[in-house]
């Protein structure tokens, strides 16, 4: 029933209004400590489920080093004591801390992952996002030099889609807020952000607000006015001035943004969820443009692309589609014309996808949103690890998050013992 209802909802959204991170190759360019060898851990930010285990959101640590006796096993978990739709997380620029939050709340939990990478611990809870900025539902945590730029999805006044970004220092002190553009075609909505320092450009994308994303699917699809309240834009910002400039119309919900990591490239790519299209953002002359450049699966079947992961050379792109449970690989040798070269069903529902820096290991999780995940036997909740040889994804391990009473597996970040550092002296 849940699967059928979600299809109906998505079809209605397409007809009425366009709908609206993850791994070693999509971190902020200001993070210097990248794991370029074998990662030791995958940190999984996990939604709590009432009646399963402690019911709390938690950060779960899984050992993913094949040489370890604990390979593919959960070795640690840190409950927050709350259940607030745990969603995304991001490293500080020094990679000592991991910031994580939920879409149903304004709290941000700060985990120390440097003192003992195998056993993260909560060292701070930031709770003034709503009070200081007026935003609600922190989504993206993007490292800046000594700072963290947080993109929210909603606001505290009407819990709609009008939102913005908040800037903090690494100690958790609020510095400034920036509203998403509402002029020159802007709709005020937000979702992801990504920076190209060489071009002094910040890109943002758009989704919807708390009032929509927290509603049960069945209720939402019956509300015609609510269905009109989804974003369909991307914006180019002057990074240094933190001012929005050109706004692009990108139908179908542009979600995750990935800049090519090739030093010779200055383009970014995103996937539009409801139209199943790939969009390229690039500079032509002095103007930034957005182009539809590819199709993901059969758009009429609404595969729902939800997460993407770009290879370190900018030549390949992984795309996960939630509804059909498929993981696809696109050749980006010509970013103007992406070509799908591989696909595999990796779950009954799949959401986030992460890859190692060398591209040889791929990790996939299952949960989208608590009220949007499938029901019954299709509601698989897992972390699955795969090996990639350039031709085939080969299954290596699985952690069943329901069986182990952990919750719904969502966002991932990679950890390494090589990044262990002593706590700085106060």
Give the location of each predicted region:
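Beta-rich, blade/repeat-based domains predominating
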Residues: 25-33, 54, 81-93, 131-147, ...
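Short, conserved, GDST-rich strand-edge loop motifs in beta-rich repeat architectures
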Residues: 37, 43-54, 150-162, 205-229, ...
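Beta-propeller blade signature
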Residues: 57-63, 162-172, 221-240, 378-390
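Blade-loop segments of beta-propeller domains
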Residues: 71-140
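A short beta-strand motif characteristic of beta-propeller blades
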Residues: 74-80, 121-131, 174-183, 243-248, ...
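Beta-propeller domains
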Residues: 92, 184-190, 194-334
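Asp-box/WD-like beta-propeller blade repeats and closely related beta-sheet repeat scaffolds
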Residues: 113-197
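Loop/turn-rich, solvent-exposed surfaces of beta-rich toroidal or solenoidal domains
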Residues: 299-383
């Amino acid at each position: 029933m849940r699967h059928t209802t979600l299809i109906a909802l998505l079809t209605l959204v397409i007809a009425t209004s366009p709908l609206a991170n993850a791994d070693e190759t999509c971190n902020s360019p200001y993070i210097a400590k990248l794991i370029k060898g074998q990662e030791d851990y995958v940190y999984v930010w996990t939604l709590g489920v009432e009646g399963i285990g402690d019911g709390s959101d938690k950060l779960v640590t899984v050992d993913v080093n094949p040489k370890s006796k604990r390979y593919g096993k959960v070795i640690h978990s840190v409950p927050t004591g709350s259940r607030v739709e745990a969603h995304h997380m991001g490293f500080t620029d020094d990679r000592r801390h991991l910031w994580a939050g939920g879409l149903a709340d304004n709290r941000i939990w700060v985990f120390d992952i440097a003192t003992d990478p195998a056993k993260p611990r909560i060292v701070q809870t930031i709770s003034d996002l709503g009070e200081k900025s007026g935003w609600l539902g922190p989504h993206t945590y993007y490292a800046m030099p000594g700072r963290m730029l947080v993109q929210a999805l909603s606001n505290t006044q009407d819990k709609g889609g009008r939102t913005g970004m908040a800037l903090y220092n690494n100690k958790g002190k609020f510095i400034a807020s920036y509203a998403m553009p509402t002029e020159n075609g802007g709709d005020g909505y937000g979702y992801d952000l990504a920076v190209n320092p060489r071009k002094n450009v910040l890109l943002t994308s758009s989704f919807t607000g708390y009032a929509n994303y927290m509603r049960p699917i069945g209720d939402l699809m019956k509300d015609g006015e609510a269905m009109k309240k989804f974003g369909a834009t991307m914006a180019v910002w002057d990074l240094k001035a933190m001012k929005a400039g050109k706004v692009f119309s990108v139908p179908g919900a542009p979600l995750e943004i990935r800049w090519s990591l090739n030093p010779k490239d200055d383009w970014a790519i995103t996937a539009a969820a409801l139209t199943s299209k790939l969009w390229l953002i690039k500079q032509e002359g002095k103007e930034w443009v957005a182009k539809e450049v590819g199709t993901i699966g059969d758009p009429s079947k609404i595969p729902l692309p939800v997460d993407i992961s770009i290879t370190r050379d900018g030549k390949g792109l992984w795309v996960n589609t939630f509804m059909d449970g498929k993981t696809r690989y696109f050749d980006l040798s010509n970013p103007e014309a992406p070509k799908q070269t591989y696909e595999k069903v990796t779950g009954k529902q799949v959401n986030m996808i992460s890859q190692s820096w060398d591209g040889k290991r791929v990790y996939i999780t299952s949960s989208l949103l608590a009220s949007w995940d499938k029901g019954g036997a299709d509601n698989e909740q897992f972390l699955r690890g795969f090996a990639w040889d350039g031709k085939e994804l080969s299954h290596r391990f699985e952690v069943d998050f329901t069986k182990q009473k952990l919750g719904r597996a969502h966002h991932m970040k990679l950890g390494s013992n090589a990044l262990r550092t002593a706590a700085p002296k106060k």
